[in-house]
């Protein structure tokens, strides 16, 4: 019995080794799981379910194969792929979740999220996030021709890269008070998230009790997953 969590794969055709590693993960490790949760940024960018990118179709087929084998797959949007919609969910068999979700995992309550909402010290990013998550802005963007959406997405990624290069690492990490507030709000002692690309298990105190924040790593030179069993919560790095 095990439930698996992954995040921040940033899949793109320019990184075939990561794509191949994910396909192997779906065919091997994930097949033994009770469920797979993808906590955002599965793709490097997403400009709409109508994008005919062959990679998207390949991933949908692979995830659907996992689901059809009896392993449900759940997805929380990330900051790169927040426009993944019902069409791709239907094609892949993934179940879309809200940005925060509490799971009962073998008697252990665990809060899961992508993690960008915890980075409240980065005021510039949070303001940008509020704009692009406006439903009207998203509807307008999705009405644009694909070639215009691609240009906008490329400019946004370039702007984000430039902005992040001038920010301190502390600003781009989670805010400790925000973490505690979220865990207290949801009444949990466990939190699993991605986004920061800083894999670690952090010990803290929530409601005057020991608590744990488990951060998934990004998939670059190796894969990263959290494995939850009835007896343990493990952060695991593995070769791609």
Swiss-Prot record:
Q: Does the keyword Membrane apply?
A: yes
Q: Where does substrate bind?
A: 79-80, 122, 160, 164, 167, 195
Regarding the membrane, this protein is recorded as: Peripheral membrane protein
Question: Which reactions does this protein catalyse?
Answer: UDP-2-N,3-O-bis[(3R)-3-hydroxytetradecanoyl]-alpha-D-glucosamine + H2O = 2-N,3-O-bis[(3R)-3-hydroxytetradecanoyl]-alpha-D-glucosaminyl 1-phosphate + UMP + 2 H(+)
- Which InterPro entries does the record match to this protein? Calcineurin-like_PHP_ApaH, LpxH-like, Metallo-depent_PP-like, UDP-diacylglucosamine_Hdrlase
Q: Which UniProt keywords apply?
A: Cell inner membrane, Cell membrane, Hydrolase, Lipid A biosynthesis, Lipid biosynthesis, Lipid metabolism, Manganese, Membrane, Metal-binding
Pathway recorded for this protein: Glycolipid biosynthesis; lipid IV(A) biosynthesis; lipid IV(A) from (3R)-3-hydroxytetradecanoyl-[acyl-carrier-protein] and UDP-N-acetyl-alpha-D-glucosamine: step 4/6
What Pfam families does the record point to? Metallophos
Q: Which residues bind Mn(2+) 2?
A: 41, 79, 114, 195
Q: What's the cofactor?
A: Mn(2+)
Q: Which residues bind Mn(2+) 1?
A: 8, 10, 41, 197
Stated EC number for the protein is 3.6.1.54
What SUPFAM superfamilies does the entry give?
Metallo-dependent phosphatases (SSF56300)
Q: How is the cofactor bound?
A: Binds 2 Mn(2+) ions per subunit in a binuclear metal center.
Q: Name one GO biological process term.
A: lipid A biosynthetic process
Query: Would the keyword Cell inner membrane turn up in this protein's UniProt record?
Result: yes
Q: Which family does it belong to?
A: Belongs to the LpxH family.
Q: Which NCBIfam families match?
A: lipid_A_lpxH, PRK05340.1
Give the function comment from the record. Hydrolyzes the pyrophosphate bond of UDP-2,3-diacylglucosamine to yield 2,3-diacylglucosamine 1-phosphate (lipid X) and UMP by catalyzing the attack of water at the alpha-P atom. Involved in the biosynthesis of lipid A, a phosphorylated glycolipid that anchors the lipopolysaccharide to the outer membrane of the cell.
Q: What is this protein called?
A: UDP-2,3-diacylglucosamine hydrolase
Q: Which organism is it from?
A: Salmonella paratyphi C (strain RKS4594)
Q: Which gene encodes it?
A: lpxH
């Amino acid at each position: 019995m095990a439930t698996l969590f992954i995040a921040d794969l940033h899949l793109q055709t320019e990184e075939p080794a990561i794509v191949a590693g994910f396909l192997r993960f779906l065919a091997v490790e994930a097949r033994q799981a009770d469920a797979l949760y993808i906590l955002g940024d599965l793709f490097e960018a997403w400009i709409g379910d109508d994008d005919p990118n062959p990679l998207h179709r390949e991933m949908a087929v692979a995830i659907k194969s996992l689901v059809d084998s009896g392993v449900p797959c759940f997805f929380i949007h990330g900051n790169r792929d927040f426009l993944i919609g019902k069409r791709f969910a239907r094609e892949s068999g993934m179940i879309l979740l809200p940005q925060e979700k509490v799971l009962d995992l073998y008697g252990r309550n665990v809060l899961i999220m992508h993690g960008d909402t915890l980075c409240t010290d980065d005021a510039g990013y949070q303001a940008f996030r509020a704009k692009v998550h406006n439903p009207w802005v998203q509807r307008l963007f999705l009405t644009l021709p694909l070639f215009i959406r691609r240009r906008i997405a490329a400019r946004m990624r370039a702007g984000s890269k430039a902005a992040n290069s001038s920010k301190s690492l502390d600003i781009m990490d989670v805010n400790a008070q925000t973490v505690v507030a979220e865990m207290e709000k949801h009444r949990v002692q466990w939190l699993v998230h991605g986004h920061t690309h800083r894999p670690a298990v952090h010990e803290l105190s929530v409601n005057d009790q020991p608590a744990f924040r488990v951060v998934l790593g990004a998939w670059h030179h190796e894969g990263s997953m959290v494995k939850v069993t009835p007896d343990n919560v493990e952060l695991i790095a593995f070769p791609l």
